[in-house]
A protein has these predicted regions:
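Short, charged/polar N-terminal "headpieces" of proteins
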Residues: 1-26
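Ser/Thr- (and often Asn-) enriched beta-sheet segments in non-cytosolic proteins
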Residues: 10-12, 17-19, 32, 45, ...
């Protein structure tokens, strides 16, 4: 499902545009990232620390690509967790 335009922000990372949104829960901040040109591609859903900075989105994109995230392909969302040691894959 594509991110809503009004409640999401755009980021350009290595000349590719992504759209992202965040949602706070009691335990963490959930960040969803998708390719702006293909909103129906694979989304990455990251659990981040409660103290969230916008530059963490770049880490999610970069490390997600290294873990096999392919936003240009239609697939189930990839679930990850951002920790002090980096991005780790987790079960959905």
């Amino acid at each position: 499902m594509a991110l809503p335009l009004k409640k999401s922000e755009m980021i350009c990372f290595y000349d590719v545009q992504y759209r992202w949104s965040k949602r706070s829960t009691n335990q963490f901040v959930e960040v969803r990232v998708e390719l702006n040109e293909n909103p129906h591609g694979q989304m990455i859903i990251a659990q981040c620390p409660r103290i969230f900075r916008e530059d963490m989105v770049e880490d999610i994109i970069e490390k997600g690509r290294e873990l096999g995230w392919k936003p240009e392909v239609t697939a189930d969302p990839m679930h990850v967790r951002l920790t002090k040691r980096g991005l780790i894959a987790r079960d959905a």
